[in-house]
UniProtKB/Swiss-Prot annotation:
GO terms for molecular function: ADP binding; ATP binding; phosphoglycerate kinase activity. It catalyses: (2R)-3-phosphoglycerate + ATP = (2R)-3-phospho-glyceroyl phosphate + ADP. Its EC number is 2.7.2.3. Belongs to the phosphoglycerate kinase family. This is Phosphoglycerate kinase.
């Protein structure tokens, strides 16, 4: 890794400003999934062991950017964090201003402070509108640490502008380091082969960049979900009422041509679970893609033969990357394909298996397999952009390693 990590710093008795990603799902004031909080704990605990004063900053949701909104407060996060740390964690009522400055000034070594939601200020998402916002955040710390991989593809103030005020003193956190190790070293730089990528989700256009990048890396590319039907239609198959991105058909044709030139095997569904709607309890059946999906039905999941074929390829692979569900996993039985892939990855411990955040990470969690794959990324969009470009705005501004 060519950037400093938190282990390269000397944070003893110093204030360390840490950008974390605590953008967790909350309902009725309760956190539904705290994986992002748990994922940040190694960095937080490391700094506390070093007797640093740790100042955490994060966004949550999409507030208007015009001041405090209770439903977007980080208070529920504080309660979970206190449980993991075993001691009180103060929440500054704002991330800038006199109350924030006082909270930072009073913070002792070996303790943690959380600043209130960064997005209560427009300056977080629009750095050009409020340079003073970045300047004040930058004034809080002696060092800066970015452990928010999931937001590092955005040029927001806290991940892109603030670290530039810490030349030689801004570093990757332990979670960020792990993300870059798996997505960079294990997937882009030196993947074990055969290398298989599985891409699902709705649109070809939203993933065309990463698809084209992966065509330079992988041996097998398995395509399903909504984008799978777009590829099938590009090949002249009858896909009925299935989700098809008409504007993506030309892109799909181009991808198929590039794959052929680069000797990459593209594998598409050979059968599908179909129904008139994706409502729970709806009557469904399986049909062969060669026979065609009837005009009044839509493909909602990969079929039994496709599951077997996909799993056979996964079992024979040494590296596997998965992003995007292959069916409507929220509605049984159209979750069977995605669940089968999750379980297939979990029973393949000899391979490097990386799940690219987002819905695929949700499927892995539902299947109870998160701990049985090599790495579950905390960033959906960030992981795809990193695979496409090989860097993120938030990682490029971290201090390079010395020498």
């Amino acid at each position: 890794m060519d950037r400093l990590t938190v282990r390269d710093l000397s944070p003893e008795e110093k204030k360390v400003l840490v950008r974390v990603d605590f953008n967790v799902p909350i309902k009725d004031g309760k956190i539904l999934d705290d994986i992002r909080i748990r994922s940040a704990m190694p960095t937080i605990n490391y700094l506390l062991q070093k007797r640093a004063a740790v100042i955490l900053m994060s966004h949550l949701g999409r507030p208007r950017g015009s001041g405090f909104e209770e439903k977007y407060s980080l208070q529920p996060v504080v309660e979970v964090l206190e449980g993991y740390l075993g001691h009180h964690v103060p929440l500054a009522p704002d991330c800038i201003g006199e109350v924030a400055r006082q909270a930072v000034a009073q913070l002792s070594p070996g303790r943690v402070l959380i600043l209130e939601n960064l997005r209560f200020h427009r300056g977080e998402e629009h750095p050009e509108e409020d340079p003073a916002f970045a300047a004040e955040l930058s004034s809080y710390g002696d060092f800066y640490v970015n452990d928010a991989f999931g937001t590092s593809h955005r040029k927001h103030t806290s991940v892109y502008t603030v670290p530039q005020a810490f030349p030689g003193r801004c570093a990757a956190g332990l979670l960020m380091e792990k993300e870059l190790e798996f997505l960079g070293t294990h997937l882009l730089i030196s993947p074990k082969r055969p290398f298989t990528a599985i891409l699902g989700g709705a649109k070809v256009s939203s993933k065309i960049g990463v698809i084209e990048a992966l065509l330079s890396q992988v041996d097998n590319l398995l395509l399903a979900g909504g984008m799978g039907y777009t590829f099938l239609k590009a090949l002249g198959k009858s896909v009925g009422n299935s989700l098809v991105e008409e504007s993506g058909i030309e892109l799909a044709t181009r991808v198929l041509q590039i794959a052929k030139q680069r000797n990459v095997r593209i594998v598409l569904p050979v059968d599908a679970k179909v129904a008139k709607t994706c409502d729970s309890g709806v009557s469904w059946s399986e049909v062969s893609i060669n026979q065609g999906i009837p005009a009044d039905l839509e493909g909602l999941d990969i079929g039994t033969q496709t599951i077997q074929e996909f799993c056979k390829i996964i079992d024979a692979s040494a590296t596997v990357f998965w992003n995007g569900p292959v069916g409507v996993y929220e509605v049984p039985p159209f979750d069977q394909g995605s669940m089968a892939i999750a379980n297939c990855l979990a029973r393949h411990p000899s391979a490097t298996t990386v799940v690219g955040g987002g819905d695929a990470a949700a499927v892995i969690a539902l299947a109870g397999c998160s701990s049985q794959v090599s790495h579950v990324s905390t960033g959906g969009g960030a992981s795809l952009e990193f695979l496409e470009k090989g860097f993120l705005p938030g990682t490029e501004v971290l201090s390079p390693t010395r020498g």
